[in-house]
A protein has these predicted regions:
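An accessory alpha-helical subdomain
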Residues: 185-229, 243, 247, 251
Length: 336
């Protein structure tokens, strides 16, 4: 990766414009300076899951003036909201994308706003535009987005210190996101708590990290009520078996719980949901227990904007094409 200081001294592409309240220009400064200035007003677009939320917590601790905006699949309302946030260019100075890599449409919006940006991501399907003079990319596989954010700001560029209270939270998020399963049941429980609280409340509750002595009594009570709700929900879901020892289930919530319960039972699992996406679209989440197939690479090969990890990946698809697409994915995964 190009050195930040060297890369940040390439005007005019790296200039950030600072506005006065009346709209007049106060001044400009270089991209490298904004990364090193913890007072920068950052628009943080981060993946709407446990990993993305913890990444947002790290960034909020590094840049107190940052605003965290959750983003999920293209085609959903949160994606459209992210584009609108980028367009509101006087509300922020620079952008950090955490736990996901912006697509072409999002980068077009960034360029139209004339803003510099930083990408911190770990997904195998991340599209790195290292020649973009507006952008700096820190993309590394093997660690989740939250842990990469923590290590980037505290170790890679040494911008801040005193965030040791967040390291354990990042490690637990890493255990869940990469499916390492070495910190069970805590990592699964933390993911459940994320979905019970929702993005904003979770960030508020864990802004100072996760105590090593365990979860709060409030969080434990949430977990106690959760299992019964999951049982009742799954019982009412549309389900069917798929070829190649697969299973299909229509679900718009409790996806992590369904994944945890069903993935060990099948060679591949497909969870289909329509909540939070545009009408006529379906969000497909693919999972596998096998280490000899690569779902993320298969979705990327199909060239429709999907992707993710070898064992877990997603795709937004027109509902009318859903069944045919699932069959195509299954054939590619198991008949090569």
């Amino acid at each position: 990766m190009t050195d930040l200081n060297e890369k940040g001294r390439t005007p005019p592409y790296k200039d950030i414009v600072e506005y006065n309240p009346d709209g007049s220009i106060r001044g400009t400064y270089y991209m490298a300076d904004w990364i090193k200035d913890t007072n920068t007003r950052v628009l943080n677009l981060t993946h709407n899951d446990l990993d993305g939320a913890v990444a947002g917590i790290v960034i909020k601790n590094v840049y107190p003036n940052s605003v965290q905006v959750p983003v999920n699949y293209k085609g959903g309302p949160d994606y459209a909201n992210a584009i609108q946030c980028i367009a509101a260019k006087r509300q922020y100075q620079a952008i950090i994308f955490s736990d996901f890599c912006p697509d072409d449409e999002m980068l077009d919006a960034v360029h139209a706003a004339g803003k510099c940006y930083l990408v911190i991501d770990h997904h195998q399907t991340a599209k790195v535009c290292d020649d973009d003079p507006y952008g700096t990319y820190y993309v590394r596989e093997g660690k989740c987005g939250a842990l990469l954010c923590y290590e980037y700001f505290t170790k890679e560029i040494g911008l801040v210190s005193g965030l040791e209270n967040l390291e354990w939270l990042c490690e637990v998020a890493n255990d869940h996101d990469l499916w390492l399963r070495k910190i069970l049941p805590l990592s699964d429980d933390l993911n459940t708590i994320f979905y019970e609280y929702g993005f904003d409340t979770f960030m508020e509750k864990f802004m100072n990290g996760l105590p090593r002595e365990g979860l709060s009594e409030e969080a434990k009570e949430l977990l106690a009520n959760h299992e019964y709700e999951v049982d009742q929900y799954i019982a009412g879901c549309v389900q069917k078996d798929l070829p190649h020892n697969g299973h299909y289930i229509e679900c718009d919530k409790f996806n992590s719980d369904i994944n945890k319960r069903m993935t060990p039972m099948y060679d591949w699992l497909v969870m289909a949901g329509t909540e939070g996406v545009d009408p006529g679209m379906t969000k497909l989440s693919f999972r596998t227990r096998r280490n000899d197939i690569n779902i993320g690479a298969t979705l990327k090969e199909l060239g429709r904007g999907g992707g993710g990890h070898p064992a877990a990946a997603g795709q937004l698809i027109p509902t009318e094409e859903r069944d045919e697409f699932i069959q195509t994915v299954g054939d590619l995964l198991f008949e090569k």
